[in-house]
């Protein structure tokens, strides 16, 4: 040790040296027992030998050796602590990855819930407006529900329909006298009843022809056939009764494709039939066509 010497006489050689509690070194000749010769303070003395304690020997060792020894210990301590730190960092990294995934899922759910919330708010606003309108005018919507169209029953063409009496022209009675000779006639220029009615309106109206007095020849057999697809009434035959009374006629109507015969009065027939028949008869009469047994038929 190059630095070791007596602090009083500065000797380096010698066998016996002492160290005081105040940190001074003295040789055997310079040492004093009461107080330190350098600083003058009361102190204790310790003789230097190989039997010193480790905590006392460390002051006389090389600093490099002490540093290396401590550095080795420090390195072991640092390596142990670094391993623990690495494990903790790996745990936190794994946890951060999980939290980031959960955060992304939560953000996506939040966006979808925001969209759904906006849609629900819009729908709620519309329903509130509609409810306010209903509270202001409830009778308006009840009236609209009451005028809802309902299904209408349609009579099957196979069923027989009895003509209703015409109260409009029931007071007017057309008298027809019996005749020995039947004057049937057939419409020549009209294909159907609807077309014949339109063709006759150009010459005379049904009201004018209805007001005319029929001739005695009108009591003979008149046959009126309607289209089964349009009216479903079948065949109406106007025939004089055997006893000469022209107030009744025999009407043939089909019922389930089987004809049945019923008796009704001329006044009970629909009011639109007599003017048309009279008009056609008057035209036939003015045209001067010969009479025969052919039945006049027309289809609606």
Swiss-Prot record:
<dbReference type="InterPro" id="IPR017907">
    <property type="entry name" value="Znf_RING_CS"/>
</dbReference>
<feature type="zinc finger region" description="RING-type">
    <location>
        <begin position="6"/>
        <end position="40"/>
    </location>
</feature>
<feature type="compositionally biased region" description="Gly residues">
    <location>
        <begin position="191"/>
        <end position="200"/>
    </location>
</feature>
<feature type="compositionally biased region" description="Polar residues">
    <location>
        <begin position="155"/>
        <end position="165"/>
    </location>
</feature>
<dbReference type="InterPro" id="IPR042123">
    <property type="entry name" value="Zip3/RNF212-like"/>
</dbReference>
<keyword id="KW-0863">Zinc-finger</keyword>
<comment type="subunit">
    <text>Homodimer.</text>
</comment>
<dbReference type="GO" id="GO:0016567">
    <property type="term" value="P:protein ubiquitination"/>
</dbReference>
<feature type="compositionally biased region" description="Polar residues">
    <location>
        <begin position="211"/>
        <end position="232"/>
    </location>
</feature>
<comment type="pathway">
    <text>Protein modification; protein ubiquitination.</text>
</comment>
<dbReference type="GO" id="GO:0007129">
    <property type="term" value="P:homologous chromosome pairing at meiosis"/>
</dbReference>
<keyword id="KW-0479">Metal-binding</keyword>
<dbReference type="GO" id="GO:0061630">
    <property type="term" value="F:ubiquitin protein ligase activity"/>
</dbReference>
<keyword id="KW-0158">Chromosome</keyword>
<dbReference type="GO" id="GO:0051026">
    <property type="term" value="P:chiasma assembly"/>
</dbReference>
<dbReference type="GO" id="GO:0008270">
    <property type="term" value="F:zinc ion binding"/>
</dbReference>
<keyword id="KW-0175">Coiled coil</keyword>
<protein>
    <recommendedName>
        <fullName>E3 ubiquitin-protein ligase RNF212B</fullName>
        <ecNumber>2.3.2.27</ecNumber>
    </recommendedName>
</protein>
<keyword id="KW-0832">Ubl conjugation</keyword>
<dbReference type="GO" id="GO:0019789">
    <property type="term" value="F:SUMO transferase activity"/>
</dbReference>
<feature type="coiled-coil region">
    <location>
        <begin position="87"/>
        <end position="124"/>
    </location>
</feature>
<feature type="compositionally biased region" description="Low complexity">
    <location>
        <begin position="166"/>
        <end position="182"/>
    </location>
</feature>
<feature type="region of interest" description="Disordered">
    <location>
        <begin position="141"/>
        <end position="232"/>
    </location>
</feature>
<keyword id="KW-0862">Zinc</keyword>
<keyword id="KW-0469">Meiosis</keyword>
<dbReference type="GO" id="GO:0000795">
    <property type="term" value="C:synaptonemal complex"/>
</dbReference>
<keyword id="KW-0808">Transferase</keyword>
<comment type="function">
    <text>Ubiquitin E3 ligase that acts as a crucial factor for crossing-over (CO) formation during meiosis. Essential for normal prophase I progression and for ensuring appropriate CO designation in meiosis. Recruits key components of the cross-over machinery either directly ou indirectly, leading to the activation of the MutL-gamma complex. The function of RNF212B in CO designation is dependent on its catalytic activity.</text>
</comment>
